Amino acid sequence: VFGVQFGTAGERIKGVEFSRLMLGGNLVSGYAHSRDLSYVAHLMKRYNTETKITETLELAEVQGINAINLTVWDKEAAVLEKHWKRGGKIKLIAQALPGQLAWGGGEKGDLDQFKRAVDMGAAAVHLQGHGTEKLWEDQRLDVIARIVDFVKSQKCLVGVAAHSLDALRECVTAKLDVDFYQKTLHTHQYYSSPRPDETGFLGKHDNSWCNDPEEVVDFMHTVDKPWIAFKVMAAGAIPPQPAFQHAFNSGADFVLAGMFDWQIEDDVDYARQALAGVRRTRPWRA
């Protein structure tokens, strides 16, 4: 089992145990990031029925993966709750947004989604990356700080996610009392990587989520909070073997990876291999 082979003492965030490889939620939720292949999201949704999602959760647990990252506003969170009622143990790291940015409607209070995540039993909750960036652009770090303080008050782990290094850097500089950061990291060694005119923190064509990987690695070396790296395969454009190795070598403490059920066993093996051969200078922060 993944967690047993590598031990658990170094895999804890504030006493809560997490596997080094975590299950991303985009594939089961249909967020394909498939560039101009518009049918892929529909294919994902048709494949990942409630039964298939449950099978995926069960297989992940058997392989030693003990956490999944899901939004609280999508129906897949309800599937996870049913899985728990049947005895499932996989932990939820929940994505949430404040009321003024909430997707799906129906949010009255600023922090309704964060309260919902805590109430449903999330092990950790983080501000979703696009929310972080919108609040940063609007110069509303006070809202981010209020989110962090609220989740902390509920005795739940809290984090901040970002695609933009500048947004994350400002959160770190503000010394927010987070338990972890979640930051994108991937190389540009794939065909649809950013072109020279794509200088923003996101690719213009739903094709990039980390425009400055070297700078990210250098900055995260200075951050003493646990780092969950996501989009390490650039939404499926980079094979898992080099993607996992690059992430762990670059200092990530955990890797969040979207996986279909039939990919999980192989991806766990690739993660084992990456950790066995890891060469990193950033200390393990969890």
Residue ranges and their predicted role:
Residues 2-87, 243-246, 285-286:
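N-terminal binding-site loop/beta-alpha segment at the start of enzyme catalytic domains
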Residues 72-89, 104-110, 131-148, 165-169, ...:
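Active-site-adjacent beta->alpha loops and helix N-cap segments on the catalytic face
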Residues 98-179, 222-223, 233:
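Glycine/proline-rich, positively charged
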Residues 262-286:
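C-terminal helical cap(s) of enzyme catalytic domains, especially alpha/beta-barrels
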